[in-house]
Each structure stands twice: as structure tokens, then as C-alpha cells.
């Protein structure tokens, strides 16, 4: 399969730079997987699309203020983007500089350059950085870090982004990008879903900066997926198996929930799904046999991204590309702060030929 098979024309004006004033009032494009039929509506329509006993699986990761500015003590400006927190003192990060720092280099971080750190080692494209500070890493990041808005949101971060670029149920700090499908859920909608008898479970996948890396190969089978840490605890496994046993559906909220659940299913030895705690490099593209999920809530993704490939594997390639074409024609808002889709599984996607 060629990466270019997953391209589509997107006017710059459809890229959302700010979220809707009310989270759950965004637009919702529903795609019926088996038929390809499209329905236009509002995100709160989700309430009518789910049945009592269905299980929504959310990702409860919390975005950290992962972008730091500063300079090398020897001179030269740097920009640091945290990939993950290693412990209370160390981070693994991308560093943008005119000349990459060498191990042992002293870094002065923060807008006022008040935080001292040392680049201790290099691991491929990533740098290990240790803070010379009594405070734990997370406290330092909260004090001096900027919210890591995606590169296509072409504006500086604002104070409001510290809450707007978080899901209302975010709990475990560690992501450098929000699981954006979850941004549309507000407390009234969650309460209404519970009232209807919709079950809820929470996985954790700390989204890494690799999620924004372009696919740099021509053939998607040659792509090497970035690694991210995921947790699927026993209570999620129990909820999934119970929902399946009673004939209800598993609805993943976002591609990160998909990747967490499917990673846990891939690693399972004796059951459909078992607890999973570890790094995952799962790459889902057409031809992948989904094991757990029956429906998906997701935003609109970048052309030629691994995420539009994941959606195509679920809904079918032609159905997905047709839906995206319709979304552009109907002026849906795209990407992290944009509108959403509700998609049901297309069993024919597994054997569909990909290509235009």
C-alpha cells in the first residue's frame, strides 16, 4: 500500500485553531461501516447512537506542559519537547537547536532561563536530560513549560489551552498530545450517558510527540511506528469481557483507546483481552483484523497519517475516503480542536483493496 493512497485535499481554512466554546456542541459525522451511509449531526447525538450496556472506553492520560524554551550555557537557543518523563529527575526529549548539545552540556531552561539541567545521553533522535533541581520533573514542567499544541495549530499556546487541551476526565499526567476525541465530552454529556446506562472504562496511553511525525516511507508496510506507554488494567478487561458476554458493543473514544485495547488483545495468551502494562508500537492499517472494538469516536486526521490508516482499517478504505471528501465539502473542522466522527465497524474492510 502506498502512503499517497491516504492523501486528500484539505483547505487551510478548515483546520481548527481553537475549540468550540462548548465542548459537546461540535459537529458529528456518523459513518455506518457496513453501508458507508453518512449522517450529519451534533456531538450530543451520540446519546441516541449508544444502547444501555454499551461500553465506552476512554483514555485518561493528562497532557503535560511539555514544551520548554531556553539555551545552552555555551550559547545558542534551544527548544525542548518532552517525549516522556523517565522519573522524578529525568526526561527523554526532542531538542531543536542549531547545533545539538553533547552529553554533559549544561542547559538553561524556562522563559527566564532559571532552571538548570544537563544533557546526559543521546538515544537516537532523543536526548536524555536531567534536571538539577530539588523539585520533581512534573512540578518543574508545570512551572515553566508551555502546552505542546500540535504543529498545525499555528499560534503560540495560551493560558486557556492548559484546560481546553485536556479532557475533562484526564487523570494521569504523561502525554504530550491530547487524546482529542475525548475533548468533546463535557460533564453534562457524561452524566446523560451514565443516566442512560452506558458503561465507562478508562485505559491510559501517554501520547508521544511521534504521533505528529509524518510517515516518511512510500510503502506503508515499511513504516516503523513510534513507541508509547499504555496501561489496560484488569477492571477494563473485566468490563470489556462482560459487555461482550451480554451482547453489547465496545466503543473506543479515540485512536489511542483503540491502540491500547488492541495491544492488550494482541498480547493476550488465554482470552480475547488481558491486562497490559508496557510500551506499544502497534501499527493498524488496512488488512488488520480488529479484535475488540465495535465502534469508534474519533476526530478528523491528517492526510497520509497513521491515524487515517487506522480508521480505514476499521471503516473500509473507500468509505473512509468518501467520508473525508464529504466532510471537506460540508466544511467540517479538522484535527485536534475540530469536529468528530462516530463510526461503526465494517467487516468487509479486512479484504478490501486499497487505492484510488
Curated annotation (Swiss-Prot):
Q: Which GO terms describe its biological process?
A: queuosine biosynthetic process; tRNA wobble guanine modification
Signal peptide positions (record): none
The catalytic activity of this protein is classed by the Enzyme Commission as 2.4.99.17
Q: What is this protein called?
A: S-adenosylmethionine:tRNA ribosyltransferase-isomerase
Q: Identify the taxonomic lineage of the organism of origin.
A: Bacteria, Pseudomonadati, Pseudomonadota, Gammaproteobacteria, Enterobacterales
Pfam families per the UniProt record, alphabetical: Queuosine_synth
Outline the subunit composition. Monomer.
Query: Which keywords annotate this record?
Result: Cytoplasm, Queuosine biosynthesis, S-adenosyl-L-methionine, Transferase
Q: Provide the species name.
A: Citrobacter koseri (strain ATCC BAA-895 / CDC 4225-83 / SGSC4696)
Q: What does this protein do?
A: Transfers and isomerizes the ribose moiety from AdoMet to the 7-aminomethyl group of 7-deazaguanine (preQ1-tRNA) to give epoxyqueuosine (oQ-tRNA).
Please state where this protein is localized. Cytoplasm
Pathway, per UniProt?
tRNA modification; tRNA-queuosine biosynthesis
Q: Which InterPro entries match?
A: QueA, QueA_dom1, QueA_dom2, QueA_sf
- Molecular function (GO) terms listed? S-adenosylmethionine:tRNA ribosyltransferase-isomerase activity
Amino acid at each position: 500500500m502506498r502512503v499517497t493512497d491516504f492523501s486528500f485535499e484539505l483547505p487551510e481554512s478548515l483546520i481548527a485553531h481553537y475549540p468550540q466554546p462548548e465542548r459537546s456542541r461540535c459537529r458529528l459525522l456518523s459513518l455506518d461501516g457496513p453501508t458507508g451511509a453518512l449522517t450529519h449531526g451534533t456531538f450530543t447525538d451520540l446519546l441516541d447512537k449508544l444502547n444501555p450496556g454499551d461500553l465506552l472506553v476512554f483514555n485518561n492520560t493528562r497532557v503535560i506542559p511539555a514544551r520548554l524554551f531556553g539555551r545552552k550555557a555555551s550559547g545558542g537557543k534551544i527548544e525542548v519537547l518532552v517525549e516522556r518523563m523517565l522519573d522524578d529527575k529525568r526526561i527523554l526529549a526532542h531538542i531543536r537547536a542549531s547545533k545539538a548539545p553533547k552529553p554533559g552540556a549544561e542547559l538553561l531552561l524556562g522563559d527566564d532561563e532559571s532552571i538548570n539541567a544537563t544533557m546526559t545521553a543521546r538515544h537516537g533522535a532523543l536526548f536524555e536530560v536531567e534536571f538539577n533541581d530539588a523539585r520533581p520533573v512534573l512540578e518543574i514542567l508545570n512551572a515553566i513549560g508551555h502546552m505542546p499544541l500540535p504543529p498545525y495549530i499555528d499560534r503560540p499556546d495560551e493560558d486557556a489551552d492548559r484546560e481546553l487541551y485536556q479532557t475533562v476526565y484526564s487523570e494521569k499526567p504523561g502525554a504530550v498530545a491530547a487524546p482529542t476525541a475525548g475533548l468533546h465530552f463535557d460533564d453534562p454529556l457524561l452524566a446523560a450517558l451514565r443516566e442512560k446506562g452506558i458503561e465507562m472504562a478508562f485505559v491510559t496511553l501517554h501520547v508521544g510527540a511521534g504521533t505528529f511525525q509524518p510517515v516518511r516511507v512510500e510503502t506503508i508496510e515499511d513504516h516503523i511506528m513510534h513507541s508509547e506507554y499504555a496501561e489496560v488494567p484488569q477492571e477494563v478487561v473485566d468490563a470489556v469481557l462482560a459487555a461482550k458476554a451480554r451482547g453489547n458493543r465496545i466503543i473506543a473514544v479515540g485512536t489511542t483507546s483503540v491502540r491500547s485495547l488492541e495491544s492488550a488483545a494482541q498480547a493476550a495468551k488465554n482470552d480475547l483481552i488481558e491486562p497490559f502494562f508496557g510500551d506499544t508500537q502497534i501499527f493498524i492499517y488496512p488488512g488488520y483484523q480488529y479484535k475488540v472494538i465495535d465502534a469508534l469516536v474519533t476526530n478528523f486526521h491528517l492526510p497520509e497519517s497513521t491515524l487515517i490508516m487506522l480508521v480505514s482499517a476499521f471503516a473500509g478504505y473507500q468509505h473512509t475516503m468518501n467520508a473525508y471528501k464529504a466532510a471537506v465539502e460540508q466544511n467540517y473542522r479538522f484535527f485536534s480542536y475540530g469536529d468528530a466522527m462516530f463510526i461503526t465497524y465494517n467487516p468487509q474492510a479486512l479484504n478490501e483493496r486499497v487505492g484510488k
